[in-house]
A protein has these predicted regions:
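Conserved beta-strand hairpin/beta-sheet module of binuclear metal-dependent hydrolase folds
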Residues: 1-50, 163, 167-182
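Cap/insert and terminal regions of metallo-dependent hydrolase folds
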Residues: 67-69, 163-169, 173-269
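Short, acidic Gly/Pro/Ser/Thr-rich loop/turn segments
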Residues: 10-13, 42, 140-144, 187-188, ...
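Short, structured coil segments at secondary-structure junctions
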Residues: 50, 81, 115, 238, ...
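Divalent metal-coordination and catalytic microenvironments
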Residues: 26, 36, 47, 64, ...
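Glycine-rich phosphate-binding "P-loop"
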Residues: 1-14, 149-161, 212-223
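Metallo-beta-lactamase
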Residues: 91-168, 235, 265-275
Length: 275
């Protein structure tokens, strides 16, 4: 399978824009897949610059309902009139970032309600065909990131911590190889990997995901102890290659790289991979 990074916080090409967000294009023998749509429509311009025709996408997935992943969704729906977008049932929750200095809505734009006929609402594990499986409701809180603490769901007048019921992950299998795609891994990359292995019966061959080890609202990386513990878990897993970026953060990436070596790589906008 081919993977092209359409949007990420950094870029490796002068002709490709970057922004805080994530969007990936995945191509297999049977499917042309869009996974997340970045913070705005810039990922569409990037796709054109990279030779990716988004009008040919036949299926799309939204990893979760934060606007750095769904901000460009309406633009995609206007460009592509056929692809269904798979997302969790809880995407219409009221999701906020809450810090001592701000309380800001970061969820789905209400205008997207006009496109509900294009959406497929998912729950649990759903095998769509021999190539695609989406799963959610990841159990466990091992090595849970403190960067999640500022992410909240408004329920009535309260703002409890987000339980990430709106998060889902994707397994793509082709020619005996499987890649795991996660947006921010808010449920914890270690926990998500365990769920992926339970679904697959083995470890995926590659992982493309943000690891959420940096809090952009506070400008803080997770403590070294937590990052190192995540690195040890990933090193002990049988995944051949991890590709990360977006919400992982530069400090955490450097510490993980020291543990994982050539098994870990970055995935800036404009980069492409073959699994």
């Amino acid at each position: 399978m081919k993977v092209v990074i359409l949007m990420e916080n950094s870029t490796c090409r002068d002709t490709v824009a970057c922004a805080h967000g994530l969007s990936m294009y995945i191509e297999t023998d049977k499917h042309k897949i869009l996974f997340d749509m970045g913070p705005d429509a810039q990922f569409i311009d990037n796709a054109k610059a990279l030779g990716v025709d988004l009008t040919q996408v036949d299926i799309a997935f939204l990893s979760h309902a934060h606007n750095d992943h769904c901000g460009g969704l309406e633009a995609f729906l206007k460009l592509n009139d056929r692809a269904k977008v798979y997302m969790q049932k809880a995407v219409w929750g009221q999701y906020y970032v809450v810090t001592p200095s701000k309380c800001a809505y970061i969820g789905m734009d209400a205008v997207l309600k006009n496109y509900e006929d294009r959406f497929v609402l998912c729950d649990g594990v759903q095998k769509l065909d021999e190539e695609l499986t989406v799963f959610s409701a990841v159990p466990g809180r091992e090595l849970w990131s403190g960067a999640n603490d500022t992410l909240r769901e408004k329920i009535g007048e309260d703002y409890p911590r987000d339980a990430f019921r709106h998060e889902q992950d994707l397994l793509v299998t082709e020619n005996g190889k499987t890649a795991l795609f996660a947006g921010c891994a808010h449920c914890g990359i270690v926990n998500i990997l365990k769920s992926a292995e339970d679904v697959l019966g083995r470890a995926p061959d590659a992982v493309f995901a943000g690891f959420h080890l940096y809090n952009p609202s506070l400008g803080k990386s997770e403590p070294d102890e937590l990052v190192d513990a995540v690195g040890e878990k990933l090193r002990g897993d049988k995944v051949a290659h991890y590709f990360t970026g977006h919400c992982t953060g530069k400090e955490a990436y450097a510490r993980l790289k020291a543990k994982l070596g050539e098994r870990l790589g970055e995935m800036p906008a404009g980069s492409d991979f073959t699994v």
